[in-house]
Amino acid sequence: MFKITRKHNLTDHVFRMDIEAPAIADRAQPGHYVDVRVNPDHSALTLPVVDCDRNLGTVSVVHRAQDLPSVQLSMLVEGDEVFEVRGPLGAPCTFPDVGKVILAAEDLGVASLFCRARTYRERGAYTICILGFENKSEVFWEDVFGAVSDELYVCTRDGSYGVKGGIATPMRAVCETYGDVERVVVMASLAQMRKAAKIAAEYDIPVVVSFDAIRPPIGSPSIFDVPDWSQEAFEFAKAPEIDAGDVDFDKLLAKEKAFFRISEDAANA
């Protein structure tokens, strides 16, 4: 059993939890994830490790209450225990030496972006962070990112807070302002990642993307497996970041649309 040592509501439906797991905390790096099982009778939640404290022996995860396993996890409080935490799983991120980097994320991807931003800042990079949300009520960790960013932009799709629009809007402005950005990291919706990749290409900036922000619910078929790539089918758990040039966004957007259409038809059956 693994004890929850801290729980913090980031929004009405998004929660951060610190879980006591010393063996995992000792080895976890940005890009790793864990499988969290609330009890032995239900599916595990696959969650990115957003932070860890080796002194306290805790790993931090952020999740949204949206399906049965995640709702069950959200109902637990400090002092409660989960049945199982497995990890660290997956592969860690790479951090090339760069002078200036743009890191952009939407929604839950913001949580995964934090440890990446902190690592780049610790390595001496000028760190520009762009955080995107649906509306003001969904905004979280603006203060946390303020501590690891040289520049910070917050945007909402409905314009209720910060810059109106998706993350691509402030990203273009930043690219126009600076001619020395050496890397872009994006974890957002497929549409926003495609826009970001096109903008970065216009300025000849290498860009990597992550699917952390749009991982499907547990038990759903992954829409991100692309068997006809020249490499193994992508799964977010196996490759935390991938070169945007290797992603066929048009194909993935078509698969995403088909996936949600099938899901909607099944729900209405």
Task: Kindly give the residue locations of the regions a language model identified.
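Short, charged beta-turn/beta-strand-edge "cap" motif at the junction between a beta-strand
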Residues: 39-43, 86-92, 241-244
